[in-house]
Amino acid sequence: MPSFDVVCEANMIEVKNAIEQSNKEISTRFDFKGSDARVEHKENEITAYADDDFKLGQVKDVLLSKMAKRNVDVRFLDHGKIEKIGGDKVKQVIKIKKGVSGDLSKKIVRLVKDSKIKVQASIQGDAVRITGGKRDDLQSVIAMLRKDVTDTPLDFNNFRD
């Protein structure tokens, strides 16, 4: 039986490339000359450093524009609160969402069951497996989920025939 998985994960290679491009632009921009503005990446966290709140906003704008150019959906990012560190400097931790949350997976299963399409949906850890008899049914489920779930970026992978 054909099946696929519904997941929520960013392309980490593109995220890393966007961070490197952001750091390169920040180091060459005139308004950041002499400041300690930078963006760091560890595991599923991005940390933006700047001299003040205004420059932190500028750093985040650069980062988000680079991510958009590299086709990384900014809905993957969960912005934390701005923290003061030594002197006037500030930082902000931005977490990268990974996996489909419990509430969202239940919502996806409910949407699939309510759609009356002949497929089954089952929650498997941080993914939702959709199984159906025909490939056309699976494609209609993908179209329906793209239309109905707009608050979280969904990826569809692990297609089996």
UniProtKB/Swiss-Prot annotation:
GO molecular function, one term: nucleotide binding
Record's GO cellular component terms: cytosol
Domain of life of the source: Bacteria
CDD domains per UniProt: YajQ_like
Keywords on record: Nucleotide-binding
Record-linked SUPFAM superfamilies: YajQ-like
UniProt signal peptide: none
InterPro entries per UniProt: DUF520, UPF0234_N, YajQ-like_sf
Similarity comment: Belongs to the YajQ family.
Function: Nucleotide-binding protein.
Protein name as annotated: Nucleotide-binding protein Bphyt_3208
Organism expressing this protein natively: Paraburkholderia phytofirmans (strain DSM 17436 / LMG 22146 / PsJN) (Burkholderia phytofirmans)
